[in-house]
Amino acid sequence: MRELTVVEVRLDDEEGSPVLILKEVEGERQLAIWMSAAGAAGILGALQDADADHPSSHERMIALIASVGAEVSVAHIGGHQEGVFYAELIVDGRPVNARPSDAIAVALRAGVPIKVAEAVLDAVGVV
């Protein structure tokens, strides 16, 4: 697995859809994940710590997990097929399926790493 960091969230020039750009922490490859406007807003909110007076659904998810004595340790992008990325949150060592946008927003808010399977980065990562 390789650790990633968020480079930017922007609109795709051709389609006008939000796209998240992630980059290897130790390397040059980047990963582009297209997503809904709501998914992009969740990530932007986490990056900007927006609206701290009103917890986001991602903050509520982290609080709920903590309330049962568990914690999120990593967001993992583990697969890619036909343009669709598959992700999960690792909660107390157990995988919990999640949309990539949600997994990344939770990771940003929880301060945990975002990681990707080497095979995914090999298949769709670009320099």
Over which residues does each language-model region extend?
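Divalent-cation
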Residues: 1-127
